[in-house]
Swiss-Prot record:
Organism phylogeny: Eukaryota, Viridiplantae, Streptophyta, Embryophyta, Tracheophyta
Protein name stated in the entry: Gibberellin 2-beta-dioxygenase 3
Misc remark: Plants overexpressing GA2OX3 exhibit extremely dwarf phenotype and are unable to achieve phase transition from vegetative to reproductive growth.
A Pfam family this chain is assigned to: DIOX_N
Organism of provenance: Oryza sativa subsp. japonica (Rice)
Gene, per the UniProt record: GA2OX3
Entry EC number(s): 1.14.11.13
């Protein structure tokens, strides 16, 4: 989603009950990408939760640490200095306002366009060469993780073509986006039993998103029964979300996961998210290989461009797929 620059106060941002220690979800699926059973584990996690943690992913700790330290340095600048990297229409620096329809959250961010496995040349933010180099090294690594995960999905689903899914994000013109989010501590609510919304509940419209954060918790996912649970933070691992488009490609076998971020009252949270989307003209419909004999598609066919435009017109928490579901 797009976050637009603006300075609304805390009282304009929705409040949530502060996470309780009992809300921590110990059942997050963990996939070891180097294990022989990775493909089956990925499919099982996508079917049950639409969400999982990836370990043994091959991205060096130093690569992740450098990107994080440079992001912290950027967000530590004065507000006028940060504002020179915005406003985000859609790319660049933004703060607080989420989307075009009134959603707000307690965060500031950088939204960046990608060409292949690096920042787009036309994307001049960030201007700092050291920050750009650190991000490009990180993006190259996390994109490889996304490709490996999607190849594991294909294998686990029994699709003969290994890159049936991953080719959608490696194709020329694929719509890849990278986001750096900073959730400052919100001390105004400390001790009141409630927390400010960092980023409101939503699903991601793309195929997959791959997230990594610092050691500060805040990410929550909704289980199938509607219960919200907190995801234990792990700065050495990646977390993968199934997106709406992948839900359609699998005809609902994989479910896009609803998630949100609750701002911490004491510590900053910094997160990096790679969003893997297909080319704008790519048609999105259930893969024929995944439809059983006589099984009908649950969705009307659409292009990624059509779905992306529909997403930008919606509120953050809207069920964007509803208008494409066959009745």
């Amino acid at each position: 989603m797009v976050v637009l620059a603006g300075p609304p106060a805390v009282d304009h941002i929705p409040l949530l009950r502060s996470p309780d220690p009992g809300d921590v979800f110990s059942g997050v699926p963990v996939v070891d990408l180097g294990s022989p059973g990775a493909a089956r584990a990925v499919v099982d996690a996508c079917e049950r939760y639409g969400f999982f943690k990836v370990v043994n992913h091959g991205v060096a700790t130093d690569t992740m640490d450098k990107a994080e330290s440079e992001a912290v340095r950027f967000f530590s600048q004065t507000q006028p200095d940060k504002d020179r990297s915005g406003p985000a229409y859609p790319f660049g620096y933004g703060s607080k306002r989420i989307g075009f329809n009134g959603d707000m959250g307690w965060l500031e961010y950088l939204l960046l366009a990608l060409d292949d496995a690096s920042l787009a040349d036309a994307c001049t933010v960030p201007s700092c060469a050291v920050f750009r180099a650190a991000l490009n090294e990180y993006i190259s690594g996390v994109r490889k993780v996304a490709v490996r995960v999607m190849e594991a999905m294909s294998e686990g689903l029994g699709i003969a073509q290994a890159d049936a899914l991953s080719a959608l994000v490696t194709a020329e013109g694929s719509d890849q986006v990278f986001r750096v989010n900073h959730y400052p501590p919100c001390r105004a609510l400390q001790g009141l039993g409630c927390s400010v919304t960092g980023f409101g509940e939503h699903t991601d419209p793309q195929l997959v998103s791959v997230l990594r954060s610092n050691g500060t918790s805040g990410l929550q996912i909704a289980l199938r029964d509607g219960q919200w649970v907190s995801v234990p933070s792990d700065r050495d691992s990646f977390f993968v979300n199934v997106g709406d488009s992948l839900q359609v490609l699998t005809n609902g076998r994989f479910k896009s996961v609803k998630h949100r971020v609750v701002a911490n009252s004491l510590k900053s949270r910094v997160s990096f998210i790679y969003f893997g989307g297909p080319p704008l003209a790519q048609r999105i419909a259930p893969l024929p290989q995944l439809l059983g004999e006589g099984e009908q598609s649950l969705y009307k066919e659409f292009t990624w461009d059509e779905y992306k435009k529909a997403a930008y017109k919606s509120r953050l928490g809207d069920n964007r797929l509803a208008q494409f579901e066959k009745k």
